[in-house]
């Protein structure tokens, strides 16, 4: 099947993927043929489909494509016939989903190809959280421990503090056994000891911030949903929702060194917090007066919202601008949906931002900025982990 080349933007489409993935129950890489010529070209990925229902026999087909890797100006543009993915459109009329979240919204804005695969065609990676990379496992265990501690003590901060100090080792070990088995491997024993020490200190500081500021815990992993103009139904799950004087306060937990989120706040790019704030204010009919990232390994709370809470472990960050991130995201949602309905899916990781139509239109359309590559701020970021690299014709 030939693809129609209609331009030179950084948009890349594979018709066979959208035609066949909807029929697939399981997908296996069979072969990957790489050719090297004047330009480096990847070509001829074969996938094996195990089909549902009556069509149960194995089928092998070739996904033929031609993608130049390297020089962005030679990147070809492909368009897909809307009829080819009619099954998906029937299930999600106009690519509309029943409900969106921060994760799906951000994926649509930053990596539309992954949005279509993950959220429309349900092509997902079902790897167990307990067997993820070590830092992801640490984050999962930390989240689970705080959630368990909150519910076990009826959201009472004093009781949480007492149990945390008296029974931390026993309780966190139970969480590790069920959600962090990777930490129990022999080669990770020193890592686990450091992790437990960091987590104990971090939760102690967290509970002290809550206690000294006289905050009430509304819920851990608190869920809310509401209708948002310009998007539709939206859902949020907040790591820790608190309240003071009838005003809401949001803590989002991160298990890393915090530089990423420090920069997000400095550059006013903390879309996750903006999404949570807008969903909660409408769903709960209360003002959200404080949102912050709590960096667990550093036991540091980063925020834009000065003067609401006080503690030596709270760091106030001044943003570079006062852009309304949520309104930008709504505009970007509409922009990306229109692209999808016109058969255009951007797959432009590592390419110069200045060459992308999205970037060109960003000022006039007031769009949310694209993430930049960690090694080159003038290029588009790659998706962490590249879960669909084979489908996009990249090497394993």
Model-derived regions, located:
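Helicase C-terminal subdomain and adjacent C-terminal extension
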Residues: 41-84
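Generic structural signal for alpha-helix starts
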Residues: 1, 43-44, 101, 266
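C-terminal accessory regions
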Residues: 3-54, 342-360
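RecB-family 4Fe-4S metal-dependent nuclease core
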Residues: 30, 37, 70-396
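A signal for specific C-terminal beta-sheet/loop modules enriched in small/flexible residues
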Residues: 1, 47-61, 130-132, 284-288
């Amino acid at each position: 099947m030939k693809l129609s080349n209609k331009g030179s933007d950084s948009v890349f489409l594979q018709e066979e993927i959208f035609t066949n993935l909807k029929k697939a129950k399981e997908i296996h890489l069979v072969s990957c043929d790489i050719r090297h010529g004047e330009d480096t070209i990847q070509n001829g990925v074969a996938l094996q489909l195990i089909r549902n229902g009556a069509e149960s026999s194995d089928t092998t087909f070739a996904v033929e494509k031609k993608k130049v890797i390297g020089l962005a100006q030679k990147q070809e543009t492909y368009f897909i016939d809307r009829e080819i993915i009619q099954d998906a459109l029937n299930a999600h009329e106009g690519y509309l989903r029943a409900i969106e979240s921060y994760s799906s919204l951000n994926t649509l804005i930053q990596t539309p190809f992954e949005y279509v695969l993950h959220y429309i065609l349900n092509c997902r990676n079902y790897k167990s959280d307990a067997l993820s990379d070590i830092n992801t496992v640490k984050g999962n265990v930390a989240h689970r421990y705080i959630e368990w501690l909150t519910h076990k003590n009826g959201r009472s901060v004093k009781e949480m503090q007492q149990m945390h100090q008296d029974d931390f080792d026993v309780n966190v070990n139970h969480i590790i056994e069920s959600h962090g088995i990777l930490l129990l491997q022999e080669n990770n024993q020193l890592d686990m000891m450091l992790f437990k020490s960091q987590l104990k200190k971090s939760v102690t500081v967290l509970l002290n911030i809550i206690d000294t500021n006289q905050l009430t815990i509304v819920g851990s992993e608190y869920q809310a949903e509401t209708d948002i103009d310009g998007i539709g139904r939206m859902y949020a799950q907040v790591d820790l929702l608190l309240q003071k004087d009838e005003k809401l306060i949001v803590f989002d937990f991160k298990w890393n060194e915090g530089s990423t989120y420090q920069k997000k706040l400095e550059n006013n790019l903390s879309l996750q917090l903006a999404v949570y704030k807008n969903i909660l204010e409408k769903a709960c009919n209360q003002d959200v007066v404080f949102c912050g990232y709590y960096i667990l390994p550093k036991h540091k709370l980063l925020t834009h919202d000065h003067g609401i809470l006080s503690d030596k472990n709270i760091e106030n960050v001044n943003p570079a601008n006062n852009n309304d991130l949520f309104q930008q995201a709504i505009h970007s949602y509409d922009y990306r949906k229109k692209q999808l309905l016109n058969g255009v899916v951007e797959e432009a990781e590592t390419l110069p931002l200045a060459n992308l139509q999205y970037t060109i239109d960003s000022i006039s359309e007031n769009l949310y900025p694209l993430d930049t590559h960690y090694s080159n701020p003038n290029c588009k970021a790659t998706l962490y982990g590249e879960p669909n690299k084979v489908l996009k014709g990249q090497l394993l």
